[in-house]
Each structure stands twice: as structure tokens, then as C-alpha cells.
Design a protein with these regions (language model features):
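One-carbon transfer enzymes
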Residues: 1-255
């Protein structure tokens, strides 16, 4: 077990972030936890509308407001089962909280910890200035097979596009792009009949954490090797609209 400091960056009070923090703390003694405040909903929607347009964003909001809460309610026991299977806990862990990890103040505080490795676990995009301030490896657990399923909900999109062989999880280095860093490891995920949009990410996270624990000693020691991605295709994904989700569920059975 390395005694070096591993800094984990995540979003405050986010379940997946806490799962990563708890999992790594139990296995590596030198973990430090840094949290970022959630982006305001207004800023998020304004940015999304500029990129995707009003109609698409309206459909995504409807999906998040109507379908996701229902899926979460119906899937609560399955999520608990997945967490237990992979040994994931989401108990609160205290840490430093910043409004933005890209601020100079946050960068200075993280540098003061002298990290041997930084693990990204659900933050906003780290900008070029942040990345240039650190010589240590910065790696990310991504819920999808990159570079084809960059962005969000890679497992769902792989199944929706009838490419189950590319439903999986990636550990990659973080660069200035969105999930475009060099691949360190990838593993396929095979959801079962009880799984859906809400449970896919938890399965991906569980497998991703197992990969991460195996990789971290080599990453810190500078022995980690770059892997060829399962496909060179590249595309950035966002949330489905409510009509996309309903159509794929009814026609193709993708939940």
C-alpha cells in the first residue's frame, strides 16, 4: 500500500463521490478529500441551452423531473444490492470545500497537500490552468467506454445504440478535453434485467473502483501503461430527452 498522499476531487454531498472516497480510504491510508460546490442550476441550464438549444434542454429537464425520480424509487433496492456487492458505502466524509476547483485558491490548497496522485470523482471540467499546476498523475473513473461514450451515461447510450459490447467503464488520464485523456484500463459491463438508467452507473462505478485499486500503485510509481481503447470512435454524450428515453424503452426495451 502506498503511503503517498492521494487527493480525491468530487462534488459535495454526491453519492458517487462519497462511494469513491469511502472505498479508497479503506484501502489507501494517505487519502485527502476535496469537494466542489455544485454548479448553480441557472448557470448549468444557460450553458446547456447555448450548446443544445431550448427544445432539447426542455426534453432533458422533463426526463430528469419525471422519469428519473420514478426510476430511483423503483430501483432503490437494486442500488442497495449493487453497493453491497461491490462494497461501496456513501457515508459522509469531511474535507475541504471550494466553490470552484479551478480557482487559484483551490489550486494552491491542493498543491500544499503535495499529492502523489489526484483522482477525479465527479467534478466540473478541470481547466488547463488547473492541470498545468500539477506534475502528479490526474486520473478519472469514467462511466463509459471512451472515446466513443464521452460525457454522461455511457452505459445507457451503448445499450440504446445496440452496442452492448461497448457498455463499460474507463480509467483514464485527465487532459484538457472532455474525457479525452489516455486510457489506462477499460472493462465491459453486463447489466441484468433488473437494471436501468439509474442502476447502470452504480455497476460501472463498482467495477471502476476495482480497476482503480489495482492501477493506483502503478500509477503512483510511474509504471502504468497506456491501453488501446476498445474503439477509436469518439462522441460526446448528454442526457436523453424524455421522448428519446420513452421511444427507446418502448421500441427497443432499453430501460
Amino acid at each position: 500500500m502506498p503511503a503517498e498522499t492521494i487527493v480525491i476531487l468530487g462534488t459535495v454531498q454526491a453519492g458517487p463521490t462519497l462511494a469513491v472516497c469511502n472505498y479508497l480510504r479503506e484501502r489507501f491510508p494517505g487519502c485527502q478529500f476535496i469537494y466542489e460546490q455544485r454548479e448553480s442550476r441557472k448557470e448549468f441550464l444557460q450553458r446547456r441551452i447555448r450548446k443544445l438549444g431550448v427544445l432539447t434542454v426542455a426534453g432533458q429537464i422533463a426526463f430528469q423531473a419525471i422519469a428519473v425520480p420514478l426510476l430511483k424509487k423503483l430501483s432503490a433496492s437494486r442500488v442497495s444490492q449493487i453497493k453491497a456487492e461491490f462494497g461501496m458505502r456513501t457515508a459522509p466524509i469531511s474535507g475541504h470545500v471550494f466553490s470552484s476547483l479551478n480557482s487559484q485558491y483551490a489550486i494552491d490548497q491542493i498543491k500544499a497537500l503535495n499529492p502523489a496522485c489526484i483522482v477525479v470523482a465527479g467534478t466540473r471540467i478541470l481547466n488547463r490552468e488547473f492541470l498545468q499546476n500539477f506534475r502528479c498523475p490526474i486520473i478519472n473513473i469514467h462511466a463509459g467506454i471512451t472515446p466513443l461514450y464521452r460525457g454522461v451515461h455511457g452505459a445507457y447510450w451503448a445499450l440504446a445504440e445496440k452496442r452492448p459490447e461497448l457498455c463499460g467503464v474507463t480509467i483514464h488520464r485527465v487532459d484538457a478535453g472532455i474525457d479525452t485523456g489516455q486510457v489506462l484500463a477499460q472493462e465491459r459491463v453486463k447489466p441484468g434485467p433488473k437494471d436501468n438508467f439509474v442502476t447502470y452507473p452504480w455497476i460501472q462505478l463498482g467495477l471502476g473502483l476495482r480497476l482503480l485499486v489495482r492501477l493506483l500503485p502503478d500509477v503512483i510509481a510511474g509504471r502504468a501503461t497506456i491501453s488501446e481503447p476498445l474503439t477509436p470512435e469518439s462522441r460526446l454524450r448528454t442526457h436523453p430527452t424524455i421522448w428519446e428515453y420513452c421511444w427507446r424503452r418502448i421500441v427497443h426495451g432499453v430501460k
